Amino acid sequence: MPREVLSILVDNHSGVLARVSSLFGRRGFNIDSLTVSATDDPEISRITIVVHDDVKVLEQIIKQTARLEETRAIFPLNTAHSLLRELLLVKVAADEANRTAIREIANIYKAKIIDLSIGSMVMELTGRAGKDRRFSGCAFTL
């Protein structure tokens, strides 16, 4: 099944995310990814949801989400004309013995080390779908 991305403009107040996500859950729709952010208008938020479903199920999702009182607009994004990126933040155990090896792996994947402490390291990785899965599949201890 193809990956579909929905951009939903909703009223910016508490409980809206819960209503949208519970609609998906009650109907048995699986959410692969969910992001919520503010817009230029402080009264409106944008919810971006990624799902893997067929066209008929996607149409049903769009219709039911559009019926929610807080929904202002819903747009399916054309993934062929969109730049889709994923973000991974991972904290790993990093002592003197393995810190160099972890840095080498981070460099291969172009991950940024954003925090370093005595016993751990936090890395950030952005890229196309799948890059984060390959990176997190490396032999790290969390």
Language model: regions and residue ranges:
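Long, contiguous binding/interaction regions
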Residues: 1-45, 50-142
